[in-house]
Amino acid sequence: EFIEVSEESFKGQWSVLCFYPADFTFVCPTELEDLQNEYAALKELGVEVFSASTDTHFTHKGWHDSSETIGKITYAMIGDPSQTLSRNFDVLNEVSGLADRGTFIIDPDGVVQAAEINAEGIGRDASTLVNKIKAAQYVRNNPGEVCPAKWQEGDETLKPSLDLVGKI
């Protein structure tokens, strides 16, 4: 089914927007499958997932219908042939016309809380994404606390203050 998605679609809920270069390629299906494997965990966190490339929605449908790997995907695949969304998120490679490999965590206010851009040949790990979302949600729900490196749900956080300066 085809749906219309706008920047308003990212408001009122946590969202992940995952740009990838192109359908029918090599690294992209491995990433999108990995994201699908974590989709239930993301939904439990109240997160909606959107993937996007500069392909058309017809190309997405063809890929979805012809690939066993991509056929498993149940989250939205955005077609951005006008390159507007890719350009707005500053992931458009103006030379190739393709989106860079970019991931954005967007809070319910529509504010980007985390952004990651990978080189074309480097795939992403969705389990790391799940942990970043948990950290972003924790910080939002616990003002005055921050999550240190390698933080996992249940770990101690930090409360920045003058007393903490130079003691970490």
Curated annotation (Swiss-Prot):
Keywords: Antioxidant, Cytoplasm, Disulfide bond, Oxidoreductase, Peroxidase, Redox-active center. Thiol-specific peroxidase that catalyzes the reduction of hydrogen peroxide and organic hydroperoxides to water and alcohols, respectively. Plays a role in cell protection against oxidative stress by detoxifying peroxides. The active site is a conserved redox-active cysteine residue, the peroxidatic cysteine (C(P)), which makes the nucleophilic attack on the peroxide substrate. The peroxide oxidizes the C(P)-SH to cysteine sulfenic acid (C(P)-SOH), which then reacts with another cysteine residue, the resolving cysteine (C(R)), to form a disulfide bridge. The disulfide is subsequently reduced by an appropriate electron donor to complete the catalytic cycle. In this typical 2-Cys peroxiredoxin, C(R) is provided by the other dimeric subunit to form an intersubunit disulfide. GO terms for biological process: cell redox homeostasis; cellular response to stress; hydrogen peroxide catabolic process; response to oxidative stress. Homodimer; disulfide-linked, upon oxidation. 5 homodimers assemble to form a ring-like decamer. Its EC number is 1.11.1.26. It comes from the Bacteria. Its main location: cytoplasm. It comes from Ferdinandcohnia aciditolerans (strain JCM 32973 / CCTCC AB 2017280 / YN-1). Belongs to the peroxiredoxin family. AhpC/Prx1 subfamily. Gene3D superfamilies: Glutaredoxin. It catalyses: a hydroperoxide + NADH + H(+) = an alcohol + NAD(+) + H2O. Residues 1-138 form the Thioredoxin domain. It is found in: Cytoplasm. One of its GO terms (cellular component) is cytosol. One of its GO terms (molecular function) is thioredoxin peroxidase activity. It holds the Pfam family AhpC-TSA. This is Alkyl hydroperoxide reductase C. CDD domains: PRX_Typ2cys. The active site is at C28.
